[in-house]
Amino acid sequence: MRYDGRKNNELRPVTMDLDFITHPEGSVLITVGGTKVICNASVEDRVPPFLRGEGKGWITAEYSMLPRATNQRTIRESSKGKISGRTMEIQRLIGRALRAVVDLEKLGERTIWIDCDVIQADGGTRTASITGAFTAMALAVGRLVEKGALKEMPITDFLAATSVGIDKEKGLILDLNYQEDSAAEVDMNVVMTGEGRFVELQGTGEEATFSRSELDGLLELAEKGIAELLEKQKEVLGDVALSIQQ
């Protein structure tokens, strides 16, 4: 039995509250157990200089964490005057993941800014951010299609992410909370599409190694969890989800 009473192959409770913030074109508060992330999608009718005149759009992301999202207060990165390597890595991961499931030419010369702000952290903030960011982006793009700004849906597939790991006593586990993540011998983040294709794998051993069979087991576990997250997205997105599936 895990710390919170879950089975090894069980996700934490997941909710997605749409339009949590009223101003963005798409907004979602995603809650995964004790982790809560506000994901906003904002649309600009312009692209970065390197894409001007190319007839393509762009999707980029920013990620941050409130000072008291964690057990002890952390200093805001804006106060430090620089972004940490971890933050930069997560921002790039979110942007890459979202671009993998969007036809940027169909998006046209516009930019979708994704802002993921962690208001409470209990493990899996980057994977929750990706899952919530996709949902917010789908909301925003669906509204562009609805009002005629886009002729067709540029999102080609669904996208979600989760974490898996190996605990010395419990074995393979899905969706690690902070306590489990801190103690895990192996920790892996997995990003997948609705068709079951991989976008990104980030896996490391902490003073430990893992076998090919364990890797296969981790991926199977992640696939199960992501399938459940995808169903949750489809449930909350309603008609927008149907337009992506067409």
Swiss-Prot record:
Name by which UniProt lists this protein: Ribonuclease PH
EC number: 2.7.7.56
Binding site for phosphate: 86, 124-126
Keywords: Nucleotidyltransferase, RNA-binding, rRNA processing, Transferase, tRNA processing, tRNA-binding
Entries under NCBIfam families matching the protein: RNasePH
Intrachain disulfide bonds: none
Reactions catalysed: tRNA(n+1) + phosphate = tRNA(n) + a ribonucleoside 5'-diphosphate
Highest taxon of source: Bacteria
UniProt-listed CDD domains: RNase_PH_bact (cd11362)
Species of origin: Bacillus licheniformis (strain ATCC 14580 / DSM 13 / JCM 2505 / CCUG 7422 / NBRC 12200 / NCIMB 9375 / NCTC 10341 / NRRL NRS-1264 / Gibson 46)
SUPFAM superfamilies (UniProt xref): Ribonuclease PH domain 2-like (SSF55666), Ribosomal protein S5 domain 2-like (SSF54211)
The protein's assembly and partners: Homohexameric ring arranged as a trimer of dimers.
Family matches, as Gene3D superfamilies: GHMP Kinase, N-terminal domain
